[in-house]
């Protein structure tokens, strides 16, 4: 672990790269990520059509909608991995393109839907990769402690010495989430983080999102499970045919008519008897 950290810092020092100033955290409720009039097409197929939204610190924003609605494309544009045909993404009121990759890596972390690690690294070394952006910053931080905390939060401490390729799909997903947490950014974008997980670990991942939001972070998460979105998200953006059909708190936008129309399948909404959270049930 220390070898990786020392190597990263040696590369920065030896290359003459500019040292970076650590980012200042912003207060809860601040818009840190914005999308304005985003559109994207692939050939004749329009994937996103004039989509705008704001992401605020202290909130979990869930992107939901049926397959092909544009959720992952929207997230990919927000991360900068995919350029929009029209529109603009801003990070902290600056155009996304105005940030260098190194500056951006100190401010936002991305958990992709799929991931590969080409070499048989130990799990702990994979998580340590999340600390790489901080090698260019003069801060007194115990990287080993940050990594240990991230691994404990995602319950992968016992996997530390395992080779990453040997893990199950769910184990890999939790390790990659630990890597994102170890990056310690105030903005996080997660693409279907619960897809490969059992119910206990699905709940655990979304509890982490809520905890990080309570600490002032901004989390954007793509979810298929409407129950998870209703239980853990502060705001939801319901995508349908490349547009935002509704945006707001789950209790306000999860209506039977809207969801039935969006998913082309009749559903009903009932309130959880204990929490009052809306439950979306298919009509059978």
Curated annotation (Swiss-Prot):
Subcellular localization: Cell membrane
Residues binding ATP, per UniProt: 65-72
Coiled coil: none
MF terms (GO), sorted A to Z: ATP binding; ATP hydrolysis activity
The keyword Membrane is assigned to this record: yes
EC number, UniProt record: 7.6.2.-
Keywords recorded for this protein, A-Z: ATP-binding, Cell membrane, Membrane, Nucleotide-binding, Translocase, Transport
Membrane topology: Peripheral membrane protein
Pfam families: ABC_tran
InterPro entries reported for this sequence: AAA+_ATPase, ABC_transporter-like_ATP-bd, ABC_transporter-like_CS, P-loop_NTPase
GO cellular component: plasma membrane
Domain ABC transporter span(s) in chain numbering: 33-266
Disulfide bonds listed in the record: none
Subunit: The complex is composed of two ATP-binding proteins (HmuV), two transmembrane proteins (HmuU) and a solute-binding protein (HmuT).
Role description: Part of the ABC transporter complex HmuTUV involved in hemin import. Responsible for energy coupling to the transport system.
The family this protein is said to belong to: Belongs to the ABC transporter superfamily. Heme (hemin) importer (TC 3.A.1.14.5) family.
NCBIfam families: PRK13548.1 (NF010068)
Protein name: Hemin import ATP-binding protein HmuV
Organism: Thermobifida fusca (strain YX)
Name of the encoding gene: hmuV
């Amino acid at each position: 672990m220390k070898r990786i950290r020392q190597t990263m810092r040696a590369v920065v020092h030896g290359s003459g790269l500019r040292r970076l100033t650590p980012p200042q955290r912003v207060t809860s409720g601040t818009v840190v990520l914005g999308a304005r009039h985003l559109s994207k097409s692939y050939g004749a197929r329009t994937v996103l059509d004039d989509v705008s939204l704001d992401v605020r610190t202290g909130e979990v924003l869930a992107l939901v909608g049926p397959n092909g609605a544009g959720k992952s494309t929207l997230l990919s544009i927000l991360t900068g991995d995919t350029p929009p045909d029209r529109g603009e993404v801003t990070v902290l009121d600056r155009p996304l393109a105005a940030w260098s990759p190194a500056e951006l890596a100190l401010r936002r972390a991305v958990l992709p839907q799929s991931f590969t690690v080409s070499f048989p690294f130990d799990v702990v070394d994979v998580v340590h990769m999340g600390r790489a952006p901080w090698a260019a910053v003069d801060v007194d931080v115990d990287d080993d402690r940050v990594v240990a905390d991230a691994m404990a939060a995602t319950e992968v401490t016992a996997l530390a010495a395992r080779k990453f390729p040997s893990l199950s799909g769910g184990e890999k997903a939790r390790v990659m989430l630990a890597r994102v947490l170890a990056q310690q950014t105030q903005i996080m974008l997660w693409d279907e983080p619960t897809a490969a997980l059992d119910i206990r670990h699905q709940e655990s991942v979304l509890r982490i999102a809520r905890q990080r939001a309570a600490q002032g972070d901004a989390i954007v998460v793509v979810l298929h499970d409407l129950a998870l979105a209703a239980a853990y998200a502060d705001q939801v953006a319901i995508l349908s045919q490349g547009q935002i059909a509704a945006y707001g708190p789950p209790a306000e936008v999860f209506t039977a008519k809207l969801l039935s129309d969006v998913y082309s399948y009749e559903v009903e909404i009932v309130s959880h008897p204990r929490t009052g959270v809306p439950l979306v049930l298919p009509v059978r």
